[in-house]
Amino acid sequence: MVKLRLKRCGRKQRAVYRIVAIDGRSRREGRDLRKVGFYDPINNQTHLNVPAILYFLAKGAQPTGTVHDISQKAGVFTEVSLNQTKFY
C-alpha cells in the first residue's frame, strides 16, 4: 500500500520534512516514489504539489495523520469529496 508520509531532512536540531509518496512497508528514510511537498515546522512553511497529492489519493494512497492535517490546513481536501477518501 502506498502512503503519503513525512521524510526527515535537514540538520541536527533543525528538522525539515519532505512529504513523499512511499511504499508503506519501507522505512522512514527509504526510497520514495515521488516527492509531493515539504513542511518546515520551525518557520511554519508548507509547499504542496496538489495535483500529485490528488493523483496518489485517487490511486488509493493513505495519508498519515500528520500529512492529513497539513493537507487539510492547506485546503487540499476541499477539491476532493471526503466520501471518496477513506482514512484509517
From Swiss-Prot:
<dbReference type="GO" id="GO:0003735">
    <property type="term" value="F:structural constituent of ribosome"/>
</dbReference>
<keyword id="KW-0687">Ribonucleoprotein</keyword>
<dbReference type="GO" id="GO:1990904">
    <property type="term" value="C:ribonucleoprotein complex"/>
</dbReference>
<dbReference type="InterPro" id="IPR020592">
    <property type="entry name" value="Ribosomal_bS16_CS"/>
</dbReference>
<protein>
    <recommendedName>
        <fullName>Small ribosomal subunit protein bS16c</fullName>
    </recommendedName>
</protein>
<dbReference type="InterPro" id="IPR023803">
    <property type="entry name" value="Ribosomal_bS16_dom_sf"/>
</dbReference>
<keyword id="KW-0934">Plastid</keyword>
<keyword id="KW-0150">Chloroplast</keyword>
<dbReference type="Pfam" id="PF00886">
    <property type="entry name" value="Ribosomal_S16"/>
</dbReference>
<keyword id="KW-0689">Ribosomal protein</keyword>
<dbReference type="InterPro" id="IPR000307">
    <property type="entry name" value="Ribosomal_bS16"/>
</dbReference>
<dbReference type="GO" id="GO:0009507">
    <property type="term" value="C:chloroplast"/>
</dbReference>
<dbReference type="GO" id="GO:0006412">
    <property type="term" value="P:translation"/>
</dbReference>
<dbReference type="GO" id="GO:0005840">
    <property type="term" value="C:ribosome"/>
</dbReference>
<comment type="similarity">
    <text>Belongs to the bacterial ribosomal protein bS16 family.</text>
</comment>
